[in-house]
């Protein structure tokens, strides 16, 4: 049988969606799923992704 891989599926969530108070934008949480290599990247991921609720690029952090 094959060994278990070091890749794990992680969820990225927008950090600015909850702090936004713009009434023109709908409330919602932007989440993305991706994979990361646990051996090479031990710390939490932090990427800039598009948030469709805020209609701009925002920082998305890895959640547990």
UniProtKB/Swiss-Prot annotation:
Gene name as annotated: rpmG
Record keyword DNA-binding present: no
Organism: Prochlorococcus marinus (strain AS9601)
GO cellular component, one term: ribonucleoprotein complex
UniProt-annotated stretches for the region Disordered: 19-40
Record-linked Gene3D superfamilies: Ribosomal protein L33 (2.20.28.120)
NCBIfam families per record: PRK00504.1, PRK00595.1, rpmG_bact
Coiled-coil stretches: none
Swiss-Prot/TrEMBL keywords: Ribonucleoprotein, Ribosomal protein
Domain of life from the UniProt record: Bacteria
Recorded GO MF terms: structural constituent of ribosome
The UniProt record lists the keyword Ribosomal protein: yes
Protein's UniProt name: Large ribosomal subunit protein bL33
InterPro entries found in the cross-reference section: Ribosomal_bL33, Ribosomal_bL33_sf, Ribosomal_zn-bd
Any Gene Ontology biological process: translation
Similarity-based family: Belongs to the bacterial ribosomal protein bL33 family.
Pfam families the UniProt entry points to: Ribosomal_L33
């Amino acid at each position: 049988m094959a060994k278990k891989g070091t890749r794990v599926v992680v969820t990225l969530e927008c950090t600015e969606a909850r702090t936004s108070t713009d009434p023109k934008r709908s409330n919602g949480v932007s989440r993305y799923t991706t994979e990361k290599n646990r051996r090479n990247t031990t710390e939490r991921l932090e990427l800039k992704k598009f948030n469709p609720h805020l209609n701009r690029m925002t920082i998305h952090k890895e959640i547990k």
